[in-house]
Amino acid sequence: MSKISPVTGHYVTIEVDGLEYKVFYLENGTGQPLVCQHTAGCHNHQWRGLLEDEEITSNYRVIAYDLPRHGKSDPPENTEWWKEEYKLTANHYVNFIVALCDALELENPLFMGSSFGGNAALQLALRHPERFAGVLAVEGADYSPGFYLDWWQHPHANAAQVCGSGTWDLMA
């Protein structure tokens, strides 16, 4: 028996810190908005199980977006981004999430982020407690020192495959 998924995909253009981003998101459900951010290096497919869960989507409008340069979301459109340093700052991502919620006209959304997204959830709670009904920091931390694996640079290791495989293992 075949079944068509009720999940739909859309693009929205938002402006963040003077840059325009074309952001892809999936959504399903009715009720209070639940905005979901994937882990770094992944995309909104991480939330597919949640997007198709009938019990969840009968109470929540689940929205899972792709960060810029991830999944189906593009780098900024109004700049020569390939010539610029790719900056990953808490300020930028907090501004990005708020701009996305504003563009989608979400009132009192819940925000859930995994790993890097969990870190963003904590920053949202700190900086915009009035804007969100609540945040869920899945594997989030208030401080992430970062890491570097020397063996990824070894000629016998394919870092792209290793990273992709590791990220896939984090998906819900």
Model-derived regions, located:
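Flexible "cap/lid" loop of the alpha/beta hydrolase fold
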Residues: 122, 126-127, 132-169
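Conserved HGGG/HGGXW glycine-rich cap/lid loop of the alpha/beta-hydrolase fold
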Residues: 21-79
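Active-site loop/oxyanion-hole signature of alpha/beta-hydrolase fold enzymes
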Residues: 17-19, 64-112
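Active-site micro-motifs of SAM-dependent methyltransferase domains
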Residues: 42, 69, 118, 142-143
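N-terminal cap/lid segment of alpha/beta-hydrolase-fold proteins
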Residues: 2-22
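Structural signature of beta-strand start/N-cap positions in the alpha/beta core
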Residues: 33, 61, 107-110, 131-134
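Gly/Ala-rich beta-loop-alpha elbow adjacent to hydrolase catalytic centers
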Residues: 113, 117, 121
